[in-house]
Regions:
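Positively charged, small/polar-rich N-terminal and surface patches that mediate targeting and assembly
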Residues: 1-65, 69-82, 89-92, 96-120
Length: 120
C-alpha cells in the first residue's frame, strides 16, 4: 500500500492506494502476549497466542479467515475485508498451524507472494 499526503489550504489529506498484485504482507505470531494487549485489541474473551495477517487484495482476508478456522482450533478475533486484516487467537501450535494453512492456500494454490511467518 502506498500513501500520498496532499496539503491543500493547510489541510492534510492522506490517500492510500493498493498496488496491483496478490501478496501476504504480514504473517506474525505473538506467542505470549501481555494480558493488557487483548483488551486494547478488543479481544475481550481471548487467551493464548495471537496471529496477525495482512493481505492484498483485501478480500482475501475472508478466505484466510475460513481456512484458518478449518485448519486448527482458533477463534477469529477480527477480520476486515476492506483492509485485508485478520487476527486469530488460540494456543501457539494452533495459531501457527492455522497461519501455515492460510499461507499454503494463498501462496501455493492461489499464487500470492508470501511473507515470512515471524514470531515474538
Amino acid at each position: 500500500m502506498a500513501s500520498t499526503v496532499i496539503e491543500l489550504d493547510e489541510k492534510k489529506r492522506i490517500i492510500q492506494e493498493f498496488v496491483p498484485g496478490k501478496q501476504v504482507t504480514l504473517c506474525h505470531v505473538i506467542a505470549s502476549p501481555d494480558y493488557s494487549l487483548y483488551g486494547k485489541l478488543g479481544l475481550i474473551d481471548a487467551r493464548g497466542a495471537i496471529g496477525i495477517m495482512t493481505i492484498t487484495p483485501s478480500e482475501a482476508a475472508m478466505i484466510a479467515a475460513d481456512v484458518s478456522t478449518k485448519a486448527a482450533a482458533v477463534e477469529i478475533g477480527f477480520v476486515d475485508r476492506f483492509n485485508g486484516s485478520l487476527v486469530i487467537t488460540g494456543d501457539v501450535a494452533a495459531v501457527e498451524a492455522a497461519l501455515r494453512s492460510v499461507m499454503q492456500v494463498l501462496c501455493d494454490m492461489m499464487g500470492y507472494s508470501p511473507a515470512p511467518m515471524t514470531k515474538t
